[in-house]
């Protein structure tokens, strides 16, 4: 079974008003799943659709490492999170976790940035 079938990416969601730079793909979902399976303490944060991009999800690990991918709709990442038994949050309600910012800051210092 393809990921799109399983997670609802192929369902018609009515006429599209906006044309995104690209739609969510199987590879996007698979990347989030691989990230979640290879790290400890992963949580998903759903970001809303914008004029430029489709709905995205940010997976944040326990150490603050993170990745962002398109997911098509919040329902898709909710299904993925349920299957992996991981929490999912709406970033507009909760914001990003402090460990994500701390990770970004550590990376900047390691790379010699400001």
Residue ranges with predicted function:
Residues 1-114:
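Intrinsic disorder
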């Amino acid at each position: 079974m393809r990921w799109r079938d399983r997670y609802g990416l192929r369902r018609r969601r009515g006429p599209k008003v906006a044309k995104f730079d690209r739609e969510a793909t199987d590879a996007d979902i698979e990347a989030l799943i691989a990230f979640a399976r290879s790290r400890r303490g992963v949580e998903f944060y759903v970001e809303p659709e914008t004029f430029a991009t489709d709905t995205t999800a940010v997976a944040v690990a326990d150490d603050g490492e993170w990745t962002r991918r398109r997911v098509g709709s919040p329902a898709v990442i909710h299904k993925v999170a349920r299957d992996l038994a991981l929490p999912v949050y709406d970033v507009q309600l909760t914001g990003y976790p402090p460990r994500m910012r701390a990770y970004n800051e550590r990376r900047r210092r390691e790379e010699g940035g400001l």
